Amino acid sequence: MENLDVHVLRHLAQWRAQGERALLATVVRTWGSSPRPIGSIMALGASGAVVGSVSGGCIEDDLIARYSHASDADALRDGAPRLLRYGVSADEAHRFGLPCGGTLELLLEFNPDAAALQQLVQWLDEGRMVRRTVDKATGQVVQQVSDAPEPLVHDGQQVANSFGPEYRMLLIGAG
């Protein structure tokens, strides 16, 4: 069974290879309770198709409304990444279903490079761990095969996330 990140990235790579506009959303910061952990990803196609999750529902619905059906759909033509924060106020946290006053910050990447996504998916299919770093100002992406997973890093200039095989532990025996 394919892990969720690979599933999301594979769909995103297919959409981009077919020339479809799309975005990749990554949870880069949370405060308080959050339905999905830092590093969770979701892909949204211009058609409104969604793969993956960043919140469990309401935020995904808002992203669909913003970027596939509404006035901000033009952003899908813009290559500059954006940070988007949900749950800043108690009313907003309630509206988007964020538990216990949680706040969530997303990095939105518009129209990631199709060739880079295909390389990423190929490395993941080969069972490699990959570190993907996005420059928030320029949108430039650097992907490198790495030896071990590292936690997501979000500094003032870059966001770096690791993708790769999931570790499994099997316990076999009686008793």
Predicted regions span which residues?
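Segments forming oxygen-rich coordination pockets for charged ligands
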Residues: M1-G175
